[in-house]
Amino acid sequence: MEIERLTTIERIHQAAKIEFMEKGFRSASLRNIVKSVGMTTGAFYGYYKSKEALFAALVGEHYDYFIEMFKTAQEDFANLPHERQPEAMEGISGQCMFQMLHYAYEHLDVFQMILCCAEGTRFCGLVDEMVEIELESTHAYLNVLAELGRPSPKIDPHLEPVSYTHLDVYKRQY
């Protein structure tokens, strides 16, 4: 049986993932990461310029893909003929949700780091960014409904973000 040898980058990533998952980005110690890999902090800087750059190497590609997947679904829906949007909403929304959940579960550790361990990085606002995208799309859709002669009641702007983060959960329960 052949023993698998990890490259230095792989060992850094493995140690960083453990440290970030245990302590979160802010409390994670770069010294602990490099020490567990058996290298110096100076040697680490030959690979990454900062602890945040290391965190970005672990989660950045997945974060960007996830947000892009969500934006694409919103854009695809908005590009449908207006008269088709009401009937197509549930299908497009459900398909997008399934794809996003599937992707997140395929990369569960990464999304745990993004959702629970990213405070102090540009990645800590995933849910907020998605809510903003959803708000913008919803406002555009409300205009489409009004154009089709199906106006909806005015939504209190202070309650919109709360309702969007909870509405889908409620809808799927019942």
Each model region followed by its residue ranges:
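N-terminal intrinsically disordered/low-complexity leader segments
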Residues: 1-5
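Helix-turn-helix
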Residues: 11, 15, 19-53, 57-58
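Short, basic, alpha-helical segments at the C-terminal edge of helix-turn-helix-like DNA-binding modules
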Residues: 60-65
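Amphipathic alpha-helical packing segments from all-alpha helical-bundle domains
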Residues: 91, 95-106, 119-148, 158-161
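Short, hydrophobic secondary-structure boundary micro-motifs
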Residues: 112-114
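Conserved small/polar residues in nucleotide/adenosyl-binding loops
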Residues: 165-174
